[in-house]
A protein has these predicted regions:
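Nucleotide-sugar donor-binding catalytic core of glycosyltransferases
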Residues: 1-63, 67-78, 90-252, 297, ...
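Short, contiguous hydrophobic alpha-helices characteristic of membrane insertion segments
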Residues: 238, 254-259, 304-312
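A charged, aromatic-enriched C-terminal amphipathic alpha-helix characteristic of glycosyltransferases
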Residues: 271-306, 311
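Short beta-strand/loop segments at the ligand-binding rim of alpha/beta enzyme cores
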Residues: 83-90
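Acidic/polar helix N-cap motif
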Residues: 23, 262, 272-273
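CheY-like receiver
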Residues: 59, 198, 266-270, 304
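Residue-level signal for the nucleotide or nucleotide-sugar donor/cofactor binding architecture
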Residues: 226, 258-261, 292
Length: 312
């Protein structure tokens, strides 16, 4: 009998977003089955991070698709791994989590795994050639992002948000560069909607991967993040560097290579020649609309599962 795959709804953190929820919602929209709510999950959240119980048995009729992070693998899959075959889909499974993840896959007899990092998928494919290991590129909800203004009509020259501020200090920019920073409490970038609106009115932002801004965590892993899709969809110039897996996936480099020795002069030069970048950002938006949505990834995941003999 084919096992029916049911997805588990990710935990909803109080006063915080969970990006994995968007993937589960797309699964549900196309008719994918889901499990019920986890009873009392807020009470066992802390404990399940640190305790890895054995699999008691595996249900012969159902498998569970669980959306996981390397740091929260045990919680993201609890209590499902006790009684079901788990099919994990991983984000942020950095090398420091590989040892724990390898042991967990063996311990719970996991047969099928998805990773958003191609390098991480390659690593586990070499470890487990007999198991089903797949790379599913990062994606986003493309319909949320807008591109209503041409670059010349935007009022924010440089939008600063996220970890990239560790690389570039906007406080040292020329006063002619109009900066909006998420680190300024008065900027009004308190919500995701605020960020989406700011992106659509910005000309330039920095786009780098964790390999650039936190190499001690990345440890050589260079992977696509939602930041690239956000900026491409919003028609913003990505000043930085693209991971090779993004270049391979879309067929070109969507960024303007950053000169870390003189970012200030580079931004001024881009401002003075802003209309020459319109063609690139238009191409980036169309590419992101065509290739960057979670709907496409869920379609791919469903096909893989059916090809492997699971039932939906």
């Amino acid at each position: 009998m084919q096992k029916i795959v049911k997805a588990k709804k990710p935990f909803i953190y109080p006063n915080n977003s969970n990006f994995k929820l968007a993937v589960w919602e797309e699964w549900a929209k196309v008719g994918g089955q889901s499990t019920g709510e986890r009873p009392l999950e807020k009470f066992y959240e802390s404990l399940s991070y640190h305790v890895d119980l054995p699999t008691l048995w595996q249900n012969k009729k159902e498998a569970r698709l669980c959306f996981c992070e390397g740091a929260s693998l045990r919680f993201d899959t609890f209590p499902d791994y006790l009684t079901h075959e788990v099919i994990p889909m991983f984000w942020d499974c950095w090398p420091k989590y590989w040892g724990v993840t390898e042991k967990w896959i063996k311990k719970h007899n996991v047969r099928t795994v998805f990773f958003t990092s191609s390098q991480t998928a390659d690593h586990f494919r070499q470890l487990f050639p007999e198991r089903n290991i797949f790379h599913i590129p990062e994606a986003i909800e493309t319909e949320l992002y807008k591109d209503e203004k041409k670059l010349r009509d935007r009022t924010i020259d440089y939008l600063e948000f996220g970890r990239c501020s560790r690389i570039v200090d906007s406080s040292k920019f020329d006063s002619s560069i109009r900066v909006l920073s998420s680190f300024n409490e008065k900027s009004g970038l308190a919500t995701r909607t605020d960020l989406i609106n700011a992106l659509s009115n910005s000309k330039i932002t920095i786009a780098l991967t964790r390999l650039d801004n936190q190499p001690e965590i990345a440890e050589g892993i260079d992977t696509l993040t939602q930041r690239y899709w956000e900026c491409m969809l919003s028609g913003v110039i990505l000043l930085g560097r693209a991971p090779q897996e993004l270049i391979d996936f879309i067929g070109y480099d969507p960024t303007v290579q950053i000169n870390l020795q003189d970012v200030n002069s580079q931004i001024i030069h881009i401002k003075e020649n802003i209309e020459s970048y319109q063609e690139l950002v238009d191409k980036n938006r169309q590419t992101a609309l065509q290739l960057g949505d979670w709907k496409l990834r869920i379609k791919e995941i469903r096909k893989i599962l059916l090809d492997l003999g699971y039932s939906l």
